[in-house]
């Protein structure tokens, strides 16, 4: 059985041979492919009337394929193009009656040759300009209307339908095609409201274009873009229905991004809806890999009352806020909360919730970021509770990897009496901290900042040789030589007073202290050190002494 071509099937036409129709061979460039059967009785796609399967089966025609196509809901799109009123849109769409301005162009009657196409183009240009205000008023601003009309007209040029095809019909066809696609889209959207197992199911589904679009029609490609834009502009209710709830949507990567977009770009109602949906699950979403971003966004845009509601839920149980602060994702929410709280009530809630777990916050990487945010965004008076805890637990905090860093920030952010108390406590324990893998950094910090350095020197006096031979303590001694000139004579005297000075020269750490002392000291102090080094010139070829003698520091 022969089939007529489908509108838009241009890519496949080249693979078929033009055999003509009704005994008239096609030699024009207009037809470029399918065998166009003129038998309107046996071709179901050219028969605009209801297909009489009984008579065809009686004539021995195999209707298997047609019946299968009917079950697949594949209809004759050509009939849709020429008989709008025959499709009722299942109660949603009513076809419009075609209205023609003037008579049809003679180039559309019967076979269309090259000259006819040329005349048709001229006629189309004239009619397009003449009817521009009426037939094309709904497409103002689209400079490609003429080319689209020409494309649709040439596509239907070989149609033997006596009703012909004019530019007005092109416009109507395009209107009908877009409205039909919109109708199909609405049906598909209604179907997509059924809850799916996968939260991404809604986004993975796409509205199938008309069957003729598979042939590569440019007009239908444009329609597909239009449909995509409509999908992108879906409202919050539609998106939430596809996931089932805002809670489930917030725990999905793509869904959370969409919700953040609604919070950023949506109206007040959208923000209120999202807030009311997540407020009861703010603890779980705040520690979720994706949900925490939505909670942060809500904290930024919500008002003080809503922000207080979030804070009340995060502090509803003792130690809960500390637990969230230590969480890899929850710490971001707490930090954002600290950045945005402004009222005394909110700050009081934060302070009272963090105090019970202070040591945990100082020792943990995520927790110390929360403390740093408090130091940065709270006033010195509001940070008093942090500085008091830092002073009280100075050694416990300073001897941890992250705690020593937080204490350095506490020193820099503190002022007045709290600053003095904290520095005095660090200086008082400087000998112990100087020998610690992490505490030595805190001692070096206050030496560099020259805060409490005199007290540090007092605590280290008499222990410079011991510290010089240690991996961590040697760094503290070098810092004293560099930043406190008054300490140099005391340090050198302790070094040269050692009975086995050669041992210090060959020590992997002490040799660096001696090099630093030779470069920083002057006068009598330096002369005494050089004299001591010369006595061990026979050691200059040893691995560590080689560095001292190669620099010729002792010869200056």
Swiss-Prot record:
Pumilio repeats lie at residues 238-276, 277-313, 316-351, 353-388, 389-424, 425-459, 460-495, 496-531. One of its GO terms (molecular function) is RNA binding. One of its GO terms (biological process) is regulation of translation. GO terms for cellular component: cytoplasm. Gene3D superfamilies: Leucine-rich Repeat Variant. The keyword Repeat applies. InterPro entries: ARM-like (IPR011989), ARM-type_fold (IPR016024), PUM-HD (IPR033133), Pumilio_RNA-bd (IPR033712), Pumilio_RNA-bd_rpt (IPR001313). CDD domains: Pumilio. It is found in: Cytoplasm. It comes from the Eukaryota. The pumilio repeats mediate the association with RNA by packing together to form a right-handed superhelix that approximates a half donut. The number as well as the specific sequence of the repeats determine the specificity for target mRNAs. This is Pumilio homolog 11. It comes from Arabidopsis thaliana.
């Amino acid at each position: 059985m022969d089939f007529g071509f489908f509108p838009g099937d241009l890519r496949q036409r080249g693979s078929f041979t033009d055999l003509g129709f009704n005994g008239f061979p096609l030699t024009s460039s207009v037809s470029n492919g399918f065998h166009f059967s003129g038998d309107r009785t046996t071709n179901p796609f050219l028969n605009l009337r209801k297909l009489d399967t009984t008579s065809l089966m009686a004539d021995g025609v195999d209707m298997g394929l047609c019946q299968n196509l009917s079950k697949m809901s594949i209809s004759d799109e050509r009939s849709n193009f020429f008989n709008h009123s025959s499709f009722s849109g299942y109660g949603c769409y009513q076809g419009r009656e075609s209205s023609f301005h003037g008579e049809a162009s003679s180039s559309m009657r019967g076979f269309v040759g090259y000259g006819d196409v040329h005349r048709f183009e001229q006629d189309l240009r004239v009619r397009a300009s003449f009817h521009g205000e009426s037939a094309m008023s709904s497409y103002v601003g689209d400079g490609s209307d003429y080319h689209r009309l020409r494309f649709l007209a040439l596509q239907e040029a070989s149609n033997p339908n006596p009703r012909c095809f004019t530019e007005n019909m092109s416009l109507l066809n395009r209107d009908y095609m877009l409205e039909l696609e919109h109708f199909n889209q609405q049906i598909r959207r209604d179907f997509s409201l059924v809850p799916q197992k996968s939260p991404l199911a809604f986004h993975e589904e796409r509205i199938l274009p008309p069957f003729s679009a598979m042939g590569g029609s440019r007009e239908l490609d444009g329609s597909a873009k239009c449909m995509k834009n409509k999908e992108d502009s879906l409202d919050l209710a539609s998106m939430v229905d596809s996931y089932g709830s805002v809670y489930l949507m917030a725990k999905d990567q793509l869904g959370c991004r969409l919700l953040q977009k609604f919070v950023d770009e949506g109206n007040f109602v959208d923000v209120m809806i999202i807030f009311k949906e997540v407020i009861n699950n703010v603890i779980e979403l705040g520690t979720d890999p994706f949900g925490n971003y939505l909670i942060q966004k809500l904290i930024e845009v919500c008002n003080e009352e809503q922000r207080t509601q979030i804070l009340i839920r995060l502090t509803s149980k003792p130690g809960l806020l500390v637990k969230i602060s230590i969480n890899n994702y929850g710490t971001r929410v707490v930090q954002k909360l600290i950045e945005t709280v402004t009222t005394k009530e909110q700050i009081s809630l934060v302070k009272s919730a963090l105090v019970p777990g202070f040591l945990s916050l100082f020792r943990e990487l995520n927790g110390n970021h929360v403390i740093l945010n408090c130091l940065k965004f709270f006033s010195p008076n509001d940070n008093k509770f942090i500085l008091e805890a830092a002073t009280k637990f100075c050694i416990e905090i300073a001897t941890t990897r992250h705690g020593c860093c937080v204490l350095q920030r506490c020193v820099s952010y503190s002022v007045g009496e709290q600053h003095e108390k904290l520095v005095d406590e660090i200086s008082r324990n400087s000998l112990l901290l100087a020998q610690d893998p992490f505490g030595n950094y805190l001692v070096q910090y206050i030496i560099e900042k020259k805060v409490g350095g005199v007290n540090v020197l007092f605590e280290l006096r008499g222990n410079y040789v011991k510290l010089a031979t240690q991996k961590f303590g040697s760094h503290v001694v070098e810092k004293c030589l560099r930043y406190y000139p008054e300490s140099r004579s005391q340090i050198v005297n302790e070094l040269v007073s050692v009975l086995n000075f050669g041992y210090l020269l060959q020590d992997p750490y002490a040799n660096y202290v001696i090099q630093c002392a030779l470069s920083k000291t002057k006068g009598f102090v330096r002369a005494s050190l050089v004299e001591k080094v010369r006595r061990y010139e026979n050691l200059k070829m040893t691995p560590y002494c080689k560095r001292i003698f190669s620099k010729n520091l002792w010869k200056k």
